[in-house]
Amino acid sequence: FNVDWFEAVSSALALELMLNRHSHDDDEQKDTSVFLFSWPSNGAMMKNKAYLSDRNDARDSSIAVARGFLKLRDFLMTLRPTHKDPLIEECGQQLHLLCHSMGNYVLQHALVSLDKLNNHKHFPQLFQHIFMCAPDVDDNIFEEDRSMVNLHMLAKQVTVYYNNGDLAMYISDYTQGNTDRLGHNGTHRPMQLHNKVSQVNCSKI
């Protein structure tokens, strides 16, 4: 939301450059590769129709993310000793997932699709860390019978970063009639979070 294609690609490139700024001085440190998943966006902030349009496009794009997760799982299976292709050389790197703002809404619905595509089996652990930055999803999304209750299965660790001064959260909360946002004040019941899920309050940063 409020990010057009050019801004999304520019942000991804800037992140990759930042993560690799020290690797050129250290021959043993490997470069980090950033892969961007984007969806149609109006790139506007204050227009209600733009927000709703972006939200619908985000939801409709989530099936592609779910399919991508399964393709990644199948590829990682080929790296197991019993199935390993001798032509594939492992890089030894870890995989992380970063979702920003409405990207967490994409992830939310991707989990619903993944559950169906995976025949309701346990989610594969694909990532070392999932970073949920300013998540534009409900603040009770990790509770029982909600779509992110099993997100922790996808990674060894999940971290939520929230900011109670985030303008986009206000727009989502009050203009669109959504329930309280996870990216605004964190989870509704922090004591019920899975032990792999933690929160960081970025309001004073």
Residue ranges, per PLM feature:
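Short catalytic micro-motifs in class I SAM-dependent methyltransferases
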Residues: 1, 101, 109, 134
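Short substrate-entry loop that stabilizes the transition state in hydrolases
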Residues: 2-8, 22
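Lipolytic serine-hydrolase domain surface
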Residues: 9, 13, 17, 27-93, ...
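Gly/Ala-rich beta-loop-alpha elbow adjacent to hydrolase catalytic centers
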Residues: 65, 99-103, 107
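Residue in the alpha/beta-hydrolase core beta-strand immediately N-terminal to the catalytic nucleophile
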Residues: 96, 100-101, 131
